[in-house]
Amino acid sequence: MFDDLPPISHKEQQEAVERIQELMAKGTSTAEAIKIVADQIRAEYAAKQQGS
């Protein structure tokens, strides 16, 4: 599940945790929140790679 995640900094990891916690606070399950944030990270990384 996480093999294709790009490398992210500690700060980015902390931000991801905060986004996951926000989603969970709104009622999203833990697994779904992690999936949503992981998909966002992948999309952001892909966009950066295309822009390079």
Swiss-Prot record:
InterPro entries xrefs: UPF0181 (IPR005371)
Domain of life: Bacteria
Pfam families tied to this protein: UPF0181
Family: Belongs to the UPF0181 family.
HAMAP family listed in its UniProt record: UPF0181 (MF_00507)
Name the UniProt record assigns to this protein: UPF0181 protein VPA0916
Organism: Vibrio parahaemolyticus serotype O3:K6 (strain RIMD 2210633)
